[in-house]
Structure formats: structure tokens, C-alpha cells
Regions:
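Catalytic P-loop NTP-binding/switch module of NTPases
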Residues: 194-202
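Structured, hydrophobic secondary-structure cores that serve as assembly/anchoring elements
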Residues: 1-96, 105-110, 129, 199, ...
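Basic, gly/Ser/Thr/Pro-rich low-complexity segments located predominantly at protein N termini
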Residues: 39, 44, 63, 440, ...
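Extended, beta-strand-rich, solvent-exposed assembly scaffolds of outer structural proteins
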Residues: 55, 94-190, 203-302, 307-309, ...
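Intrinsic disorder/low-complexity signature
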Residues: 171, 182, 245, 306, ...
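Short, flexible domain-boundary/linker segments around small modular repeats
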Residues: 195, 317-326
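Long, low-complexity, polar/charged, intrinsically disordered or flexibly structured peripheral segments
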Residues: 447-476, 481
Length: 768
């Protein structure tokens, strides 16, 4: 860059070289559009292997020609693809979760399909703040050997429904989950205020209070605020009244120095409770108050404020938490551990009031068990787990049931495969101490999208539906909505398009013509199979000579016949499949091995995986179809099944099109896309000879690299290509209009389609 000399000496100035390296784009990124067993609808998914396809779309499916095409693509050399799932009537499994007061969260599977009916959700409060936050676990169950077993699982911790919090459940889950999506229920309403309550204080805690000591806190997520705690007035006649008087002084001082909206009161047994009055801009949702240590001279711990110091903090949003799954009881402290301990429970299903198993007695310790009286609550919970496990053989409905301590609560979770099962406890001494009695908060064992019934804190949603194979309108989609074909608007670059569903039904010619036009716009190439109704040479000849006219494009190639191979989805019965996926893989393999300028045809262009073809063409039949621009698939002894044609949709002899051959057209598309992306730097540069020379330099270097790789005809660069950008291509009028005109020419390599060998006898001269 230019320097500004100010002192005598030597200066270094860096001068731009004018080099902008132009890199060729990929040539074989393939887009597949059509029906799959499952997956997100109208959302392009980038995959790099068939295993990726299986994970995202469910693998091979008898109703999905696309699934077989994707398999063939990767078998034949493809490495990079996008898949757009299109289906009629596809729906995601849903369910609504309730709090103690009403519906709060709508849950849907991440994509449509019956797979979402196998999701189970667990909500529990074992968080950093059990009084305010919740954890959400999502598990996908999959079938394995006839049994549903856990598959993918996700865990989201310390969530809240306060939309202004960093741990806002909807934002956090939707940003990270591959299994579900959350939405706030329309009926969700916030009420009340956030509050922070100290642990029990004594006179020694609050008086005497050293001068200059401080506390820190946030209010409604704003802060932190730090204030100095005043020295309280002299205590009263007794320790209790003295503590109360000192606490009143401290509370009054803190509220006086706080922003408007903070109130304080003495509650319980010598506890200070601070309340954050509703934020008027966002009533109750963000109402909260949290104490923590001040930067210096902190007395937050001495006043037992904040979670870390034994206090409790409950945000207003806590009342909107979805109820914990399972059955949760509040322990009566201190727990009275009698000589024997047991609970009695019923097992219920769904909304039914009548148990499916009633009066199950669960001995926890003492007679008739050999377990000793527990010494602590944690030990009692461990013994409850042992008791539940021990009863499982005789009571199968208790199989897998577990108990968990969360703060001063005990949560008992069913282990049943049925998510609608719940436990109800009946009154008893041990049950009451544990909080596991008739008044216990009972909920379904697991929230279940799609199959969960309306019961307790669960509201039944819609079942997941895979949908049906798409109609023409589904495949074409809508450009404004970016659906169907136009879902590819969300893909930066693709080179090849395959739509197998558009060739397996009636009335789909319009879809193909629209897709070809879209390919022309995106500088892509479409591979098309002759319709499944075209099964013989005569039908192919008739169809190609008339019906296929709308498909004649430089940006398409049409192939006949189809592939045959055993179908794994039908017990290995040999089936017929579109060849487009295998051909796209062949294109990719040829590009990698030889270059985009090599025709994807010939004896080396074998189709991997195919055991045969739906029709066997003879040389004469092939010779009749080739001049029409219909590319043949052939099977030869030893060689196997190969691609035996290299013509575009405009490749009929009668059309005499300059882009008759596939490699010529695909090379041109490669050049166009590469030059388009590689010359963006030219925009807004000064439009004169220095710019034009840099254009010639950079584009010339790119074209010369291709020449050296054998992409063009000619022995010398002059014979093979040219780049022109000067005052002849860009006139003064062009400059005034803001235009730079660049002319790039190339001499394409055309395939040797017909090999003619001339043979003659050598005749000895006759002696006369």
C-alpha cells in the first residue's frame, strides 16, 4: 500500500501483483429430489455417503425409487450429494406439555414421518436450581430384533421458559436438537414475581454487621448491582427480636438502594425474602432476583443469600415449567425412619382412573426384607430402588422403575415401554414421609409425541405420518416458498439433477420440463430415465420421436433401458430401477479419473451393482435410437453393463446442435460456473486497460491449466483457447454503461462415437 514519507530513510511499499487465482468448481455434486421413507420435507440435506442417507432418510424403501438411486450413486463413484425429500401428506409427530396451570410447550419431531412416534421425552428438575429450571431428555427408540431399544438421545440442561434468558428452552433446543423442535404454546401466560429467600438467619449472622460490607445481585436479568449493607440498629430485648430488627434494617436498606421494583419482607423463621416486581415491559416473564458475592468485602454468604449460600431463588418463569415426568413427592423433613418401611402403589395407564394393577406393596426396609433401617434419605432412596428392582419379576409393570432424589423431592419413574403408564401412591407412614402418597404430583412416565394420550400433564398431538409418494405439484413445488424443485434455491452449487419420481408416473412431463429449465438457469445438467412405461425398443423409438420433444435440451441427457438387480426391500426379488443415480455416480467417477471433458461412456463406464437391464438392445436397435439422441445402456460379455451413449437432449442428428455431446456441454457449464465465481473481484474495479490485462492474466492462467490437463483440442495454447478483454471487446460506450466484456473461446474435445476400420487385401503385382 502507498506510504507517507515523513522522515529521511528507506520505506517499503508492497505492490499488488494483480493475481486472483481462479479455481475450478466441482462438476459432480448431485441433487436428488423425490420420496424417501422419512426425513425433513423440502429441506436439502447434504450427504457424503449412503450411511448419511440412511441416518437422515431411513435407507432403502420399496416405495422410494430415489433411495435406490442414491445407493447406486455412491456405488458408482459419487461422493457429494444433496437430497430433497418430497411427499404428500407428510406430518411430524407432536405433543403438548403442561405446567401445573396449563399448556406451555408444543413439541414436534424434527421432521415428518412415523419415526417421530418413537420419541420419548423426560422432564426432571435435577438442575443447578431445582426450584426454577428443568432438564429435558429426548430419546429415539428403534426396533432391533423385534424389540424397541433406545437409539439416539439428547440432553438439554438448566432450561427455562424465560425468553430473555440465555438458557431459553425454545432457542436452545431448536438450535441444537436433531430430534425435536419446540414452540411456546399460545396459551402460555406468565404470572407472579421472581423472589430470592435467604436461609434461616441468627442474630450473630446479622448483628453486629461490619461497616462497608457489600452484596451483589441482578434484577430481571439486569445488573449486577452492588450496594453497601448498613450497620443495623441496636438489637431488641431478645436474640430473636434483635435478629428480626437487624434483618428489617438490612432489608429496608437494600430495597432503598435498589432499582424500583425490589421489595423485601421477613418470612418463615428469620428469613429475608426479596421480590422482583413484574417488569412492566414484559410482565412476569423475566421477573427474577439473584444474589452472588460482591467484588470486595462481600457479606452475601453471611446473609445466606443466593443458591451457593443455602438460599432459594425462584424465577417467575418457574411456574411455567412443564411438569416433571413420573411421580414426584415432596419429602417431609426430617424423615422418620421407622423400624419398617414400605409404600403401596397402583399402576395406571393414560387418563384412566382405574388402575391396571392395584395395591402393590413395596417393602423398602425392615421386615419382611433383610434391608436395614436407612441412616439417610439417600440411603432410603437407594433401598427403594432395590425394592422396585426386586419386585419386577413378580410385577412386570414395575420392571425398569427407578427412584431419584432431587433436592427435597423423590421422583419415581416407570420403566414401561408404554409412555402413558404412571404410578399412584396411597397413604401410609413411609409414603407420607417420602411425599409419596395420594396427594403426590403424578404424571405420565414419558411424554410421547404422536402416541401420547391426553392425560395428566400431557395433551395428545398429531401422529407422525410418512406421507405418500409425491404428485406432480409436490415435485415442482413453489419457487417463492422454496419447496419441491425450488428447495434447491437453498443450495449454493449443484451440477447434476436426478428426479426419479418424475419418470415413474403419468402426467409428469411438465415436472421434467420445469426441472430442465431450472437446470439451465443454475448451469446444471439433468439425467433422465425414459419413463417406466417405455419398456421395449419400439416404445422407446416412438416415445423419443414424439413425446420426448419437450425434454430436448442442451442441459439434459436421456437414457434407456432401466437397471435390474435384486431388491433388498422385497426379499431379494429382482426389481427394475431408474438408472439416473448410477449414471450420476458414473459421471462423478469419470470426472475424477479423466476429467469433465471425457464422455461418461464406453467399456470403462461400467455400472456397478446392476445385474442386468430391463431390455436388451441389439446393435441395430441401438443404431436406430442413437441418432434420435437417446443414450443406450448395454450389456456385453465380460465387460458387463455399461453406458453406451454420450449425447445430450439436443443430440439428435436432425438438430445439428453444437452441444450435441455430453462432455462438450458439461465442460462448457464447468467453464461458465468457474468463470462466474472466479471473476467477482472484477466488479467495481476501475474499467480500463490495467483491469483488462489482469483479467486476461488470471483467466488465461486458468484456461492454460485446463489445456495442460488435456481438456481442449490443439497442440498449442493458441489452438486450444483464447481470452480476450481489451478495447475491442469493451468500447468507450460499454465503459460508460459500466460494462466489461470478456470473450473466452475453447476448442472442445468430442468423443469418438464411431470407429471405422478400413481393411483391404494387399495384392501382389501380376506378372505379364
Amino acid at each position: 500500500m502507498p506510504v507517507a514519507p515523513t522522515y529521511p530513510g528507506v520505506y517499503i511499499e508492497e505492490i499488488p501483483s494483480g493475481v486472483h487465482t481462479l479455481t475450478g468448481v466441482s462438476t459432480s455434486i448431485t441433487a436428488f429430489i423425490g420420496y424417501t421413507a422419512r426425513g425433513t420435507v423440502n429441506d436439502p440435506v447434504h450427504i457424503f455417503s449412503f450411511a448419511d442417507f440412511e441416518r437422515a432418510f431411513g435407507g432403502l424403501d420399496g416405495a422410494s425409487p430415489l433411495s435406490h438411486c442414491v445407493k447406486h450413486f455412491f456405488q458408482n463413484g459419487g461422493t457429494d450429494a444433496y437430497v430433497v425429500r418430497v411427499a404428500q401428506g407428510a406430518a411430524a409427530a407432536t405433543v403438548t406439555l403442561r405446567s401445573a396451570t396449563g399448556p406451555v410447550l408444543d413439541v414436534s419431531a424434527a421432521s415428518s414421518g412415523t419415526w417421530g412416534n418413537s420419541l420419548q421425552l423426560d422432564v426432571e428438575y435435577a438442575t443447578s436450581n431445582p426450584a426454577s429450571l428443568f432438564n429435558l431428555k429426548v430419546t429415539e427408540y428403534i426396533e432391533r430384533n423385534g424389540t424397541m431399544v433406545p437409539g439416539r438421545a439428547e440432553m438439554f440442561r438448566n432450561l427455562t421458559l424465560n425468553g430473555f434468558d440465555a438458557n431459553y428452552a425454545v432457542a436452545m433446543v431448536n438450535a441444537q436438537s436433531q430430534l425435536i423442535a419446540l414452540t411456546k404454546n399460545a396459551a402460555l401466560a406468565f404470572a407472579g414475581n421472581g423472589r430470592s429467600t435467604s436461609d434461616t438467619l441468627t442474630l450473630a449472622d446479622v448483628n453486629p454487621m461490619p461497616a462497608g460490607y457489600r452484596v451483589a445481585y441482578t434484577i430481571n436479568g439486569v445488573g449486577p448491582y452492588e450496594i453497601t449493607v448498613p450497620v443495623p440498629t441496636a438489637p431488641g430485648a431478645t436474640a430473636a427480636t434483635g435478629a428480626t430488627a437487624a434483618m428489617n434494617d438490612i432489608a429496608a436498606a437494600i430495597t432503598a438502594k435498589s432499582p424500583p421494583g425490589v421489595t423485601a419482607a421477613i418470612v418463615g423463621t428469620n428469613q429475608i425474602e426479596f421480590t422482583a416486581v413484574t417488569d412492566l415491559a414484559h410482565p412476569s416473564e423475566r421477573s427474577s432476583i439473584h444474589f452472588f458475592d460482591a467484588g470486595t468485602n462481600s457479606v452475601t454468604a453471611r446473609l445466606k443469600l443466593g443458591l451457593a449460600n443455602g438460599g432459594t431463588e425462584i424465577d417467575a418463569a418457574a411456574t411455567t415449567r412443564p411438569l416433571s415426568t413420573g411421580t414426584t413427592g415432596t419429602v417431609v423433613l426430617p424423615v422418620a425412619f421407622a423400624a419398617t418401611g414400605s409404600v403401596t402403589m397402583d399402576v395406571l395407564k393414560g387418563a384412566g382412573a382405574l388402575p391396571i394393577a392395584a395395591g402393590i406393596v413395596v417393602p423398602i426396609w425392615g421386615a419382611p426384607t433383610a434391608r436395614p433401617v436407612p441412616a439417610s434419605l439417600d440411603e432410603a432412596v437407594a433401598q427403594l430402588n432395590n425394592a422396585l428392582s426386586g419386585l419386577a419379576p413378580a410385577q412386570p409393570l414395575l420392571a425398569g422403575a427407578t427412584a431419584q432424589r432431587i433436592g427435597n423431592t423423590i421422583r419415581v419413574l416407570p420403566g414401561s415401554d408404554d409412555p402413558n403408564v404412571s404410578f399412584r401412591f396411597t397413604v401410609g407412614a413411609t409414603a407420607t414421609s417420602f411425599g409419596l402418597d395420594a396427594a403426590t404430583a403424578r404424571n405420565v412416565g414419558h411424554y410421547a409425541p404422536g402416541v401420547g394420550v391426553t392425560a395428566l400433564a400431557q395433551m395428545q398431538g398429531a401422529g407422525g405420518n410418512n406421507g405418500m409418494p409425491p404428485a406432480a405439484t409436490d415435485l415442482s413445488g413453489n419457487e417463492a416458498a422454496k419447496t419441491g424443485l425450488y428447495a434447491l434455491e437453498n443450495v449454493d452449487l449443484f451440477n447434476i439433477l436426478v428426479m426419479p419420481d418424475a419418470t415413474v408416473g403419468a402426467g409428469l412431463m411438465g415436472v421434467l420440463t420445469e426441472a430442465i429449465a431450472y437446470c439451465s438457469r443454475r448451469r446444471a445438467f439433468m439425467i433422465i430415465d425414459a419413463p417406466e412405461t417405455v419398456g421395449t425398443f419400439a416404445q422407446a423409438q416412438t416415445w423419443m420421436g414424439s413425446t420426448a420433444s419437450p425434454l430436448r435440451s442442451r442441459n439434459s441427457a436421456i437414457y434407456f433401458p432401466r437397471l435390474r438387480e435384486p431388491d433388498p426391500t422385497k426379499n431379494g426379488i429382482v426389481g427394475t430401477f431408474p438408472a439416473a443415480g448410477a449414471l450420476a455416480g458414473l459421471y462423478a467417477r469419470t470426472d475424477a479419473e479423466r476429467g469433465v471433458w471425457k464422455a461418461p461412456a464406453g467399456t470403462t463406464a461400467n455400472i456397478v451393482g446392476a445385474t442386468g437391464l430391463s431390455y436388451t438392445l441389439t446393435d441395430r436397435e441401438n443404431g436406430a435410437l442413437n441418432p434420435l439422441g437417446l443414450n443406450a445402456l448395454r450389456t456385453f460379455p465380460v465387460i458387463g453393463t455399461v453406458s453406451w451413449g454420450a449425447r445430450t437432449g439436443r443430440g439428435a442428428d436432425a438438430l445439428a446442435d453444437e452441444y450435441k455431446y455430453i462432455p462438450v456441454r458439461r465442460l462448457a457449464l464447468f467453464l461458465e460456473e468457474s468463470l462466474y465465481r472466479g471473476t467477482q473481484w472484477v466488479v467495481f474495479e476501475p474499467n480500463d486497460e490495467p483491469l483488462w490485462s489482469r483479467v486476461r492474466l488470471n483467466l488465461g492462467a486458468f484456461m492454460h491449466t485446463l489445456f495442460a490437463q488435456g481438456a481442449f483440442q490443439g497442440k498449442t495454447p493458441r489452438d486450444a483457447y483464447f481470452v480476450k478483454c481489451d478495447k475491442e471487446t469493451t468500447t468507450p460506450n460499454d465503459v460508460d454503461l459500466g460494462r466489461v466484456n470478456i470473450v473466452v473461446g475453447f476448442a472442445p474435445l468430442k468423443p469418438a462415437e464411431f470407429v471405422i476400420i478400413q481393411i483391404q487385401q494387399i495384392v501382389q503385382a501380376l506378372q505379364t
